[in-house]
Design a protein with these regions (language model features):
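Short, surface-exposed loop/turn motifs with a glycine/proline- and acidic-biased composition
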Residues: 23, 42-77
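Glycine-centered coil/turn sites that cap beta-strands in beta-rich domains
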Residues: 1-6, 10-31, 40, 52-55, ...
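Extracellular and select intracellular beta-sandwich modules with Ser/Thr-enriched
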Residues: 79-83
Length: 89
């Protein structure tokens, strides 16, 4: 399960929390409102349980992204869930 980020809206950092029922290969991506991938926060195997990861509002190149709505998406096998978050400047 993918939980709502906190804080939301955020500036400059937010925490993304998720639960895994079993050991899984996990991909966690950030997208802009046009569906373009902004950042990949996670791509690898994780143990079951409660996890959290921080996003600092930066893209893959380490540059700060602009204010606005973003989406974060988790995928594990056949499961995929997406939520929205807002970055304020």
């Amino acid at each position: 399960a993918l939980h709502q980020n906190y804080p939301n809206p955020f500036n400059p950092v937010t925490q993304i929390r998720y639960d895994l029922p079993e050991k899984s290969n996990v991909t966690l991506l950030i997208y802009d409102i046009l569906g373009r991938e902004v950042a990949a926060l996670l791509n690898g195997e994780q143990e079951p349980g409660y996890h959290s990861i921080m996003w600092n509002g930066q893209n893959r190149s380490g540059q700060a992204v602009g204010a606005g709505m973003y989406f974060y998406s988790i995928q594990t096998g056949q499961f995929r869930q997406t939520r929205k978050m807002i970055l304020l400047k």
